[in-house]
Amino acid sequence: MTHYVIYFDICAFFLSIVLLIMFFGKKDRHRVHNRIFEILLIDELIMSTADVMSAAMIASPNALDPTIRAVTNLFNYLYLIPHTMIPVIFSSYIMIMIGYSKKVSKKFMVAFAIPYAIVLGFLLTNPFTGAIFTSSETNPYMRGPFMPLLYLAGHL
């Protein structure tokens, strides 16, 4: 079976919890940049939780059981969808912090959203195509041929 090192994700989970607790103690959470930061923290919490659960299930002795594989796939989606949102969230946060968000044209916003929309389309069609990842009776997790697209879209 595949062995995953999940120390980073476990630390990220606890760090996200601590930061969320600290964040909810703030008085000015209603500001736009704080709301985006809150979304980023929740995104990270979902991502780290799903990645730890997915890795634990893949390493499980019952990983090839069809039910376990289905739940593992669900956790993979719960990891990948928020993971692909990180560049959009970070970019939005930066644009708001520097005051650029008020000057953004609709064309820019469409161009900004296209990479995320493409990746989201691949993820939503993945159960039928296996383009991003898949599992089989012999392997609980296999990267698909378009997995590098997720990394490419993150850099656009």
What are these regions (language model features)?
Residues 7-28, 32-92, 109-129:
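Hydrophobic alpha-helical transmembrane segments of multi-pass membrane proteins
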Residues 88-105:
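Class A GPCR helix-loop hinge within the 7TM core
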